[in-house]
């Protein structure tokens, strides 16, 4: 009977198996891809944030002043109106976004399955006109003298561009602009999330006699909870950074709209008109804290990072 030989001391090592070597190489490649994200995050996220914090707690000479800059901007008569304007805009924008995006996604999923591919493509198109381009298009649309929907504007009692962009109407106007450019992508995301809901759940609801509305309210929407929370966090962060739209509309209004309508405009005013980057950084830190607080609230209330729910 043959006996397997014993491994002698000093014997040559057994060559590493190709599969193990390939797995190790694949792991290193994964770290390489992820490292690019962290480098960009450090350069354009964490680094600027740390620098802004330093500017916010120091003066132009580099001396620490603690919360002096925060107190100074808080006492500016333009501070609270700017934040109030954006707060009203966010309420309108987020409510319309959630209701319309979820509603349209449910409609696509339930009633327009055959046409959904074409519809999703068209939902993406408005996003091609973002920022300044979108604002310019909407300024053209909102001017009754040249707008293709002038009949609608006249019917609403808006005879001139100044009537359309009256300060009291700006939160609604900016919410419409934001929905036009940003909702399409979220509709497609929600539609994809609906497709991941097991068909057995929907079939069980139908067997139990649930109507389409009850199925949506008690089955589909609860399963979209985390996606809705994720959308709210990103939309809130984007909304607090509102700048391009009020800036362009303000320039076109010939002084009718304030140059500091939004907090970002106020920070811009501090930095580039008053040459006060310290107060501008303080405003940006206020926005950062507000965004982080809102994100934390949504995460904890929705269980966004809970596993298995």
Residue locations for each model-derived region?
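Short, Lys/Arg-rich, polar N-terminal cytosolic tail immediately upstream
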Residues: 1-25
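A structural signal for multi-pass alpha-helical bundles of membrane permease subunits
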Residues: 26-309
């Amino acid at each position: 009977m043959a006996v397997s030989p014993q491994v002698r001391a000093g014997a040559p090592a057994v060559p590493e198996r190709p599969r193990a070597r390939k797995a190790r190489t694949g792991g290193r490649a994964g770290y390489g891809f992820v490292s690019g994200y962290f480098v960009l995050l450090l350069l354009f996220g964490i680094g600027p944030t740390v620098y802004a914090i330093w500017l916010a707690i120091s003066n132009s000479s580099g001396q620490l002043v603690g919360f002096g800059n925060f107190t100074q901007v808080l006492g500016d008569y333009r501070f609270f109106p700017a934040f109030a304007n954006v707060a009203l805009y966010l309420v309108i924008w987020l409510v319309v976004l959630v209701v319309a995006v979820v509603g349209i996604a449910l409609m696509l999923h339930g009633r327009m399955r055959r046409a959904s591919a074409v519809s999703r493509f068209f939902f993406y198109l408005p996003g091609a006109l973002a920022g300044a381009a979108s604002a310019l298009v909407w300024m053209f649309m909102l001017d009754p003298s040249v707008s293709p929907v002038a009949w609608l504007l006249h019917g609403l009692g808006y005879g001139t561009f100044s009537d359309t962009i009256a300060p009291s109407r700006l939160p609604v106007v900016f919410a419409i602009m934001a929905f036009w450019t940003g909702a399409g992508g979220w509709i497609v995301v929600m539609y994809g999330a609906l497709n991941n809901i097991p068909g057995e759940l929907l079939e069980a609801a139908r067997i139990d006699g649930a109507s389409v509305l009850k199925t949506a309210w008690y089955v589909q929407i609860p399963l979209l909870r985390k996606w809705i929370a994720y959308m709210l966090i990103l939309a809130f962060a984007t909304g607090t950074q509102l700048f391009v739209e009020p800036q362009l509309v303000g320039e076109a209004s010939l002084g009718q709209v304030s140059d500091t309508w939004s907090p970002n405009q106020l920070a811009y005013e501090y930095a580039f008109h008053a040459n006060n980057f310290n107060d501008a950084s303080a405003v940006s830190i206020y926005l950062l804290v507000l965004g982080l607080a809102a994100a934390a609230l949504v995460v904890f209330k929705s269980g966004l990072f809970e596993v298995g729910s």
